[in-house]
Amino acid sequence: MDNAANIVDWRYFEDTRNQLGPGFIKILGYFREDGEASVAKIEAAMHAKDAAALVIPAHTLKGESRQFGAEPLAAVAERIEDEARRCVEQGRFPDELIPDVVKLKQLFAATIDLFDEATNPRLKKPAAGGFGRKVANTSFGRAGG
């Protein structure tokens, strides 16, 4: 889970879970929906070469990501937001953000996978060594044993 620790600061995630209580799963669902929309808007703005249209979805994703401890995702969104603002002021399009947008999409997907794993017990991987308990009496029901 080294990678998970690098993508999500679980202390912030758990703090948010504790603060929101029973509403946590619903709010996490909003994060997923808003995040998907923000990533799609950022990609559309890149295709349209519209620097101004990058700012709000990047800003939104930055703030929501930090709320759940997804700092690497927030950092990429912040870079996109800051560079887009600069480019709006300069009257140019930030082509240099293409790798950041690709990274943003990948990080968002990885973050959502980790959040799902942390909140849905069915998605948790089984412990190594098989399933169930080891039976102590293995001769039960066998002839001659």
Residue ranges and their predicted role:
Residues 1-7, 24-32, 38, 64-79, ...:
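Amphipathic, coiled-coil-like alpha-helical segments
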Residues 1-19:
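Extended low-complexity intrinsically disordered regions
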Residues 53-54, 73:
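Solenoid-repeat scaffolds in large eukaryotic assemblies
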